[in-house]
Structures are given as C-alpha cells and as structure tokens.
Amino acid sequence: MKNIIFMGTPSYATCILKELIDKGFNVQALFTQSDKPVGRKQILTPSDTKKFVLENNLNIEIFTPKSLKDENIINEIKILKPDFIVVAAYGKILPKEILDIAPCINLHASLLPKYRGASPIQSAILNGDKISGVCTMLMEEGLDSGAILESTECDIEGKNSAEVFIMFSNLAAKLTISTLLNFEKIIPKKQDESLVIHCKKIKKEDGLITLDNASEIYQKFLAFYPWPGIFFENGMKFLDIELIDSEKTQKSGVILQVEKESFLLSCKKGILKIKTLQESGKKVLDAKTYLNGKRLKLGDSLF
C-alpha cells in the first residue's frame, strides 16, 4: 500500500481524493486552503476536500498552512515519509524542499503544454477547442512546466465550464490511479516549450460583453458558466443563449425574430438566440416576457 500526501482544495480535488481512498491508497495527510468566509453572513467555511474528510470521519491529518516554506511544515512532511505527493488544484506553489521529498504528481485540467496556469478549462472553451483533457505531470519548480506522465482527452465542444469540470474530475480521478500504479514503468515526456500557452486567473470583469461577435459571446457564455457569467456595461445579464449564426454581418442589437419563449438578436457579426435574461437588480425573466414588459417588438433595438 502506497503512502500518499494529498494537496487539493475544490470539488475537483475531492473527486480524486475519494478515488485514492476507494482504491486502497493510504492517504496520510490532506493539505488544503484555510477556511474562508462565504456568503452574505461571511460564515467561515472549510474547503471542499476538508469538508469531505471531516464529514466522513476519515483518519487523515489536515494541514492548512499559510506557507509551504515553513520549516515545521517541511519537517512534518518528511516525518510522514510519503511515497508520493499528489497535487490537484491546491492553490499554493510547492518549494524545492518539498519537491525533493517524494515524487510530486500534479493533475492539470488541460493537455499540457497548452493552458499552463489558473484557468485551463475556461481557456480551452474560450478558444473554441473541440478536444481537451487532463494530464498527470511530474512537478518541478516552474508553473505547470514539469514532464508529462500520462494524459487522457475528451470532446468538450458545446459544453460549459461546469459540465467540463465534472467530466474532468472523473477523468483525473481515474488517471491518478493509473499513474500511481504504473509510475515505475512510465517514461516522463518533456513538454515542448514552443507550444506553451499560458492562461490567467478569471476575474469578474472578464464576463463583460458587447454585441460585436456572436461566436465570441457564445464561447464566453460557455466558458464563464456559472461564474462570472456574461453581462453588459449596463448590468444586463444573458443567462441562457444559443449561437444561431456566426458569419452574417448587420447592425447589432436588433430583434430579428420573436419566438414563443425567446428572440433572435443581431450582432455585428452573427446572430444569437436569447432565452433568459436579467436586468441589473431585477428578477430573471424568459426572453418573451422581457420583450412584452418593455413593449419591444420585431425590428426594435434591445437597448
């Protein structure tokens, strides 16, 4: 039985942690982010992985260090003598002192060297990639730059971030087990630095849209679901849309067709079907109800 130290924070990591336990690995310790204030009442809430360990009364020691460079933390890890350190969306950089203790295997939600960084799923969707996947990587000091151990790919076309997140969680869980069981036989493959694409952390303002390009708006809608969503300068949000045409050029913002519960809206390039929307500070409405309330009709401008 292999001894594992697991480092991870969100539900993506919990899926992997659960699989490790189910497959009989000895998870000695969980390293995760500190409890964070959540919601209007700012209630101090544990990470998803910590919550999983506590709710299931698992005999796994939990660490929430502010820094992994703390000598006491490094010594704690050395004392445990892990066979592997498995890292999945932990949120902290591992210093060389920890990388040298045992093989550190990172689960990354892209087919590296594409999308190194904090938003690989959203970036793949934004760029309209039809295929993406997850990989296991032997960690080094650089950001997502280590040698690839194994990878698995799948079709993400037309799927939003929430859907891909669930798919990748399951793929990553299975891939983790495969990599650990076959580690001695796997030949690590260096990443091709000429193919590197970096991706940044998503901010709320990334969801801002204008009616220029229907295809780009639709990819943003998929990539930024459920957060930050897509919205206009005036605060209006499009909550459910479809891409109808990506090429036709015309005046933007015109209601081209009114349907039972939706309407077609022109962009400078392309056409969108608007199904559900929400004005700033108002309740969510289906598109037809919104038009009726505003007394908007075929040929009118939405704004």
From Swiss-Prot:
Q: Which UniProt keywords apply?
A: Protein biosynthesis, Transferase
- Can you name one GO molecular function term for this protein? methionyl-tRNA formyltransferase activity
The enzyme's first-digit EC class, named in words, is transferase
Q: Which PROSITE patterns match?
A: GART (PS00373)
Residue positions binding (6S)-5,6,7,8-tetrahydrofolate: S110, L111, L112, P113
Catalyses which reaction? L-methionyl-tRNA(fMet) + (6R)-10-formyltetrahydrofolate = N-formyl-L-methionyl-tRNA(fMet) + (6S)-5,6,7,8-tetrahydrofolate + H(+)
E.C. code? 2.1.2.9
Q: Give any Gene Ontology cellular component.
A: cytosol
A Pfam family hit: Formyl_trans_N
Output the HAMAP family linked to this UniProt entry: Formyl_trans (MF_00182)
Instruction: Give the family this protein belongs to, as stated in its UniProt record.
Output: Belongs to the Fmt family.
* Functional note: Attaches a formyl group to the free amino group of methionyl-tRNA(fMet). The formyl group appears to play a dual role in the initiator identity of N-formylmethionyl-tRNA by promoting its recognition by IF2 and preventing the misappropriation of this tRNA by the elongation apparatus.
Protein name in the entry: Methionyl-tRNA formyltransferase
